[in-house]
Amino acid sequence: MIWHVQNENFILDSTRIFMKAFHLLLFHGSFIFPECILIFGLILLLMIDSTSDQKDRPWFYFISSTSLVMSITALLFRWKEEPIISFSGNFQTNNFNEIFQFLILLCSTLCIPLSVEYIECTEMAITEFLLFVLTATLGGMFLCGANDLITIFVAPECFSLCSYLLSGYTKRDVRSNEATTKYLLMGGASSSILVHGFSWLYGSSGGEIELQEIVNGLINTQMYNSPGISIALISITVGIGFKLSPAPFHQWTPDVYEGSPTPVVAFLSVTSKVAASASATRIFDIPFYFSSNEWHLLLEILAILSMILGNLIAITQTSMKRMLAYSSIGQIGYVIIGIIVGDSNDGYASMITYMLFYISMNLGTFACIVSFGLRTGTDNIRDYAGLYTKDPFLALSLALCLLSLGGLPPLAGFFGKLYLFWCGWQAGLYFLVSMGLLTSVVSIYYYLKIIKLLMTGRNQEITPHVRNYRRSTLRSNNSIEWSMTVCVIASTIPGISMNPILAIAQDTLF
């Protein structure tokens, strides 16, 4: 009898929860319409994979790419609408969040064609790969619009779990397993520290979880200058630092870059930084409004360490992927300058602009690495010697992307850094900008060293990998070259016409 009553209560409670969720989705679903498109794409992928006897791979790519493009279209149609807070304060929709969601969707859209040939050559399971990519994209999009502590924790966990699975996708590779283990352990530790910081914020504000309500709660409780807020600030900085991977929270980055499948590295190298940057700007700017001097100092230290260590250690690397790992650590130091400058001096606009260029530069470089790796099976920098003699298009594409990453004019990377450093200088961050300029010069050195190998490799320096280089005849070859071409164009042409991009970025401010 007691069991029967308990069972009835459980059914009633479950029904209430389901009805409440259905009510929220019915009345607030339009506010997350781009996310709903991705969810529908995920369901469609699962249905086709479980019901079709003959796996028709082009359909999986088509469904994934179409859902991403449709989601981008839905975002563009919603541009410049009034800011809206939905789902009982859990989710906020405004231009600032949507531009970061657009960047994440753009990354995923470019990464899928980039990975087609790799998946065919390595015979990886295509459905699971696309499911993890779309789910990680969904988690990143929810993180960009998260407006309370619970959503800010759950959304990156959705992204992180898919990232762990993607990084260990080649199960037979010892390096991949080692990278996944390190990534998983450090990711779990950072999530624990992040939640610890959230608990201090929650307690100090009198039990508030929404970002703006936390500020009001801190004013009411007079706890905005308490030691608890300092503990929360340090803990949250460490937690977010793992996602952004600045020094000294970068230990996982080189191993994961080297051990994971290259298309996965391309995806993680940009999407994780875009989503974490969006979250960091909101967390530091709103709940820690009264501790701006403290978090400015913390981020300045992280930026300086990242720019110095990332670029200096990159010089000594012999693997292309490890070199790009340390390069990305240096690049995030430049992005942090925009976060510190904030809204007052176009800091966020400069950060968004540089992020857009960084996506094209980084993905273009990885597209070249994927293409070269599939033809030769090597990742060593010296094995690129003389590539121009065998594949001029690939060599020129890689050279342009590397030059843009280094910030040489008139490429997009130069104007992105120029705008970022100018905003930092206007805000009085003279030492930080000076370090950025010096480390940019250092980065140009190791990029030019690779370009010299590509273009001027002598006959005795050309390795058997390039000497026996053969272009692929697979039908999917066009897809990776398509991604490569788009990224190369985006790394060069925007440097000539910057005004429209800056105008769009400046419209995304709070």
From Swiss-Prot:
<keyword id="KW-0934">Plastid</keyword>
<feature type="transmembrane region" description="Helical">
    <location>
        <begin position="418"/>
        <end position="438"/>
    </location>
</feature>
<dbReference type="InterPro" id="IPR010096">
    <property type="entry name" value="NADH-Q_OxRdtase_suN/2"/>
</dbReference>
<feature type="transmembrane region" description="Helical">
    <location>
        <begin position="229"/>
        <end position="249"/>
    </location>
</feature>
<keyword id="KW-0521">NADP</keyword>
<keyword id="KW-0618">Plastoquinone</keyword>
<feature type="transmembrane region" description="Helical">
    <location>
        <begin position="99"/>
        <end position="119"/>
    </location>
</feature>
<comment type="function">
    <text>NDH shuttles electrons from NAD(P)H:plastoquinone, via FMN and iron-sulfur (Fe-S) centers, to quinones in the photosynthetic chain and possibly in a chloroplast respiratory chain. The immediate electron acceptor for the enzyme in this species is believed to be plastoquinone. Couples the redox reaction to proton translocation, and thus conserves the redox energy in a proton gradient.</text>
</comment>
<feature type="transmembrane region" description="Helical">
    <location>
        <begin position="484"/>
        <end position="504"/>
    </location>
</feature>
<feature type="transmembrane region" description="Helical">
    <location>
        <begin position="124"/>
        <end position="144"/>
    </location>
</feature>
<dbReference type="GO" id="GO:0009535">
    <property type="term" value="C:chloroplast thylakoid membrane"/>
</dbReference>
<dbReference type="InterPro" id="IPR001750">
    <property type="entry name" value="ND/Mrp_TM"/>
</dbReference>
<feature type="transmembrane region" description="Helical">
    <location>
        <begin position="24"/>
        <end position="44"/>
    </location>
</feature>
<keyword id="KW-0520">NAD</keyword>
<dbReference type="GO" id="GO:0042773">
    <property type="term" value="P:ATP synthesis coupled electron transport"/>
</dbReference>
<keyword id="KW-0812">Transmembrane</keyword>
<dbReference type="InterPro" id="IPR045693">
    <property type="entry name" value="Ndh2_N"/>
</dbReference>
<dbReference type="GO" id="GO:0008137">
    <property type="term" value="F:NADH dehydrogenase (ubiquinone) activity"/>
</dbReference>
<keyword id="KW-1278">Translocase</keyword>
<feature type="transmembrane region" description="Helical">
    <location>
        <begin position="59"/>
        <end position="79"/>
    </location>
</feature>
<keyword id="KW-0793">Thylakoid</keyword>
<dbReference type="GO" id="GO:0048038">
    <property type="term" value="F:quinone binding"/>
</dbReference>
<comment type="subunit">
    <text>NDH is composed of at least 16 different subunits, 5 of which are encoded in the nucleus.</text>
</comment>
<feature type="transmembrane region" description="Helical">
    <location>
        <begin position="149"/>
        <end position="169"/>
    </location>
</feature>
<comment type="similarity">
    <text>Belongs to the complex I subunit 2 family.</text>
</comment>
<feature type="transmembrane region" description="Helical">
    <location>
        <begin position="395"/>
        <end position="415"/>
    </location>
</feature>
<keyword id="KW-1133">Transmembrane helix</keyword>
<keyword id="KW-0813">Transport</keyword>
<protein>
    <recommendedName>
        <fullName>NAD(P)H-quinone oxidoreductase subunit 2, chloroplastic</fullName>
        <ecNumber>7.1.1.-</ecNumber>
    </recommendedName>
</protein>
<dbReference type="GO" id="GO:0019684">
    <property type="term" value="P:photosynthesis, light reaction"/>
</dbReference>
<feature type="transmembrane region" description="Helical">
    <location>
        <begin position="354"/>
        <end position="374"/>
    </location>
</feature>
<keyword id="KW-0150">Chloroplast</keyword>
<keyword id="KW-0472">Membrane</keyword>
<feature type="transmembrane region" description="Helical">
    <location>
        <begin position="323"/>
        <end position="343"/>
    </location>
</feature>
<dbReference type="Pfam" id="PF00361">
    <property type="entry name" value="Proton_antipo_M"/>
</dbReference>
<feature type="transmembrane region" description="Helical">
    <location>
        <begin position="183"/>
        <end position="203"/>
    </location>
</feature>
<dbReference type="Pfam" id="PF19530">
    <property type="entry name" value="Ndh2_N"/>
</dbReference>
<feature type="transmembrane region" description="Helical">
    <location>
        <begin position="295"/>
        <end position="315"/>
    </location>
</feature>
<keyword id="KW-0874">Quinone</keyword>
